[in-house]
């Protein structure tokens, strides 16, 4: 494998869930966000916004609306930096209106391209944090409470919370977690289902893992999330 410092940062990345109380400088936070902006973006729309959540009361409300008393709560409360990553078309729609142009975003493209833009920016930000010697962890359950988070952060229509990025100085050095073998995820010209040998090897590496709760949403919860997405202007 080619030796490269950037590749090393990428390959060594792991989620950190225990942080030192040391504050992260504003300069570092802004550098991380600027790095997020350098991610690829569809048609240069930059369909994202980043909300730095420093208000402790707002943090408490977000925890209550999303993770409740789950184990996730502890590392969220310890993390010095919270960055809420949102899909944002409100800014672009306003930008078009100021120029006398019509908003012609289709609902499907608005949802898909917005999520992709936000996700690409989020990954850039994680790598930037790693390069600065910081640890980070995503809180994915944010998307299960779009209305609650939107109300807490005063998000207008056409802005949707996607994921929360927690950042801080790491107070642990966890091992990198196993991934599927490359031959199970890299296909050429057509899809091939991994054979049973790879499946068993992967099961052994993951031990007692099971599909986590965000993938097991009850039907009524799924319907509620879809309704709240629509209320934020995303008709999926």
Task: Tell where the protein language model's regions lie, with residue ranges.
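Acidic, surface-exposed loops and disordered segments
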Residues: 1-236
């Amino acid at each position: 494998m080619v030796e490269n410092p950037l590749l090393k940062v990428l390959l060594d990345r792991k989620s950190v869930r225990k942080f030192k109380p040391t504050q992260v400088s504003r300069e570092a936070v802004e550098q991380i966000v600027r790095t997020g902006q350098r991610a690829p973006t569809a048609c240069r729309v930059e369909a994202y916004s980043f909300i730095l959540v420093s208000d402790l009361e707002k943090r408490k409300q977000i925890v209550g609306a999303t993770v409740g008393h789950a184990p996730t709560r502890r590392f969220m409360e310890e993390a010095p930096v919270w960055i809420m990553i949102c899909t944002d078309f409100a800014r672009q729609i306003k930008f078009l209106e100021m120029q006398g142009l019509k908003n012609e975003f289709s609902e499907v493209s608005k949802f898909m391209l917005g999520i992709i833009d936000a996700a690409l920016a989020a990954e850039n930000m994680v790598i930037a944090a790693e390069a600065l010697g910081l640890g980070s962890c995503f809180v994915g359950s944010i998307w299960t409470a779009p209305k609650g988070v939107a109300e807490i952060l005063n998000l207008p229509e056409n802005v949707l919370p996607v994921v929360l990025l927690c950042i801080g100085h790491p107070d642990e050095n966890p091992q990198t977690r196993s991934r599927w073998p490359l031959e199970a995820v890299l296909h050429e010209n057509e899809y091939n289902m991994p054979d049973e040998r790879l499946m068993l090897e992967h099961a052994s590496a993951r031990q007692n893992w099971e599909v986590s709760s965000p993938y097991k949403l009850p039907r009524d919860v799924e319907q509620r999330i879809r309704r709240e997405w629509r209320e934020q202007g995303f008709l999926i």
